[in-house]
């Protein structure tokens, strides 16, 4: 019995029940079933409609799970809503990978609605099609119609990239065998192809490919590119066909899991043996022999194709066209298989048993290996569920027509609260008009972020980025989704090889489409003038953006093709700053092209040119070494991938990588770098924070950049206005629950203050914003909005250029104290500032083992002085448009050199360096939720490992900074010390006039005393405080000056108490006051004796009343007071911390009576 729409009403018969079933995608379906049907039969009845097998269904009604053996009537569910969820997978076995429903993709590919959907044209997406996925595994269908990724946040086992290469090769061998079988048995194929799409059961056979922390390449060729005149559905393969694999081919079609995938239980990588490689190569040879006769016929057809007349030979034309398509697809798969296997090597110098290893990751190659994959970083917060569903652009079979129109975008139904991106490109025009149901539907990739808020989902449609001449555009087919759902809009532009890209954001409340670009009409307009690279750039930009917003940004790897190493930037501290007032310099920018989850998945989105060959043509190399270093430090998203315009534009790709994959980042070096001739534009320019932060948290100057001149972005880049509108749309959607206004330019400081309810988080002198670096953080947070930061992350440095005057003024006032920015003054201020960090450096390295003979304190201080001197000189002197680019380069270079320097000083022990970093994080995060601190330290350890493995700074570059014990002091600080002494002569005479004590006592106490909190690192600010406080400083003894200054700064750190509270009235927190009660000596002897007797459990010999009267006698009480005073006097005399000058009235209370 077919289900009807939830809005429909059906006449209920006495022996029937109307049951409403609501699934997790918020769709409600109505079923009319017999009253005597039991729950198991009901599950089987609805399985086809909900695309969930009956054995995996769990029906819940009023908090109870319906039992299979009971009847529906017993639960009284008539007319009620039952919730349907999927049963959790078994945790003790490998996934079977063969449980997809029959309707998961048929609506998408056929264009006709299935019964039970909520509107015509809506597609039925099985959220968990192709079964579940265990830790670190992907279930991939045999035809590429859907890919669902469920990522378990637990630690994934270590597996082998060579093993994945073999699995990929075996999958492609299986596909080649299927194509050969179709060519050899044409009859069955024709019968299959003659069925119309809506009636074709979409039975998806899954394969399980184990991808783990060593995997760097995506499983490709599950959705191969389409020929514009392909008459048949290439990937539609019956699951009953058994591939003719060799005995080593452990990837049979159907539910059997892929054999070579190692079990997730193992902790060591299961590398394949060379014998397995040989077996796969032998199978390839057999396939080549089978393909040879068809290849000869293929050559004959192509040789005569230019002049052959098919006017009266429709059957011959279809046969030849079919042969061309199938042989061409076979050649593509065969070539990809050889490419996948060509990087497998065996090192004969190793001791047996030897295994295979990979010399070049798949990301090294451009589009032939990773074509038609959307650039989606999978970002996961702890506890989130991420589902990536990729629906390949698959032309459905048609009875006699060879028409597939890749230009039309299929309207797709999305769940509520979805962030939708439709990026569809046009292909070649079809030979004739084709009906909308025969259109080629775009690849759909969804990423759900489930948290307390409703699901935030990113939905991106990307079709073939084939650079073909613009064809006749076709309108979207069918209505744009049912009410209440996000709409997927795909507009085509005649004459453009790439269609414009649309970003539509919808919230759970009344959804409204939000066009992402300001230049065109609101919804139906077309983006003009964004350049040929818009599709790729926007796909990558939105991918990285949504990923960063859903989680912590972590790493980037880029470089020129000639470089051997790639840059990897560690995690930024922006999120920690937003959640706790930490004294970091700025909400550090994070990369857009690579991001990682909580120790599970590291996803990099890349784009490169799409030439016909398998290798990327080398772009022009910069001539200068500093230019190469600039490029190495970062190229994120400025312009699109290819350096030259024209049809050969980049294709969005997806590369699935895991933390700690050396080959991945090395391949990214070659793969990411397109034509660049100028230093990259930067993100925010925070100077280095205090030393421990410089070594620990890499916030100061995260990777970023683009391929643009310092004056602006290149002609192929996205306009800043367009970029801003996209960012505002996504931010408004994701931050709407926090009260953010749409299109708001609210600063980060105002945003955090509004959320925290406190008005002094970023005010000068408030908690977490003291000292030079705290004031710098306050400046950046007050001037940067969320949109500005995200734009900076993606290489649009306009916000940074806008902040240049404020930064220069800030450095002039807070750094130089109003003096002229001469080299001597800058050196003096740098020395004063960095010297104040000595206690922090000493504290940070107090618990780790430093390399023998190395003076770690001097090494860090002198290194930071040199680096910060360059940064400050640049900020104070640079006035041209290259301000931001050079500043970013200085910050990045200083950061990497700092990490490399300290790693060298710690004897190359990464664990020691991680201990320094995590210790600093814990000290900075006092009072923060311990689980958050633990997560931060864990994430930092993972990121640090990746960064250190691919450090772009070699040991030779930092040896000049190493200081040994006994080395002569550096001569540079002498001048600052002299100037510093001259500067301080002004307040000293006043103090000498006010007190006979030496005038240097206060300065000595200040230099020897512990610096107050992170803010105390700024000694020039302390000097300023002394100068500003001259009136009271002259009126008190000089030794009181540092004590009063410390008290002032300590009082500023204390958060204000609510007015007129108990704590306010009593002068101390209520909890502390309660714990203090009863402590200290009792002034009444009777009370003291009573408490002592009670504590000891003693009982008086006489009555308590008689004892009390005796103790209250005046002479006894006076003797007690004298004894108490004597004890206190003795305690004060023996206390080294007691000073009569600090407590001038103490003698009145405790001295003998006059």
From Swiss-Prot:
The modification Phosphothreonine is found at residues 117, 1075. Transmembrane segments: none annotated. The record marks 1023-1024 as: Cleavage. A motif (Nuclear localization site) lies at residues 1034-1076. Residues 1044-1154 are annotated as: Sufficient for the delivery of client proteins to the endoplasmic reticulum. Keywords: Acetylation, Apoptosis, Chaperone, Chromatin regulator, Cytoplasm, Differentiation, Immunity, Nucleus, Phosphoprotein, Repeat, Secreted, Spermatogenesis, Transport. ATP-independent molecular chaperone preventing the aggregation of misfolded and hydrophobic patches-containing proteins. Functions as part of a cytosolic protein quality control complex, the BAG6/BAT3 complex, which maintains these client proteins in a soluble state and participates in their proper delivery to the endoplasmic reticulum or alternatively can promote their sorting to the proteasome where they undergo degradation. The BAG6/BAT3 complex is involved in the post-translational delivery of tail-anchored/type II transmembrane proteins to the endoplasmic reticulum membrane. Involved in DNA damage-induced apoptosis: following DNA damage, accumulates in the nucleus and forms a complex with p300/EP300, enhancing p300/EP300-mediated p53/TP53 acetylation leading to increase p53/TP53 transcriptional activity. When nuclear, may also act as a component of some chromatin regulator complex that regulates histone 3 'Lys-4' dimethylation (H3K4me2). The ubiquitin-like domain mediates interaction with the E3 ubiquitin-protein ligase RNF126 which is responsible for the BAG6-dependent ubiquitination of client proteins. SGTA also binds this domain and competes with RNF126 to antagonize client protein ubiquitination and degradation. The ubiquitin-like domain also mediates the interaction with USP13. This is Large proline-rich protein BAG6.
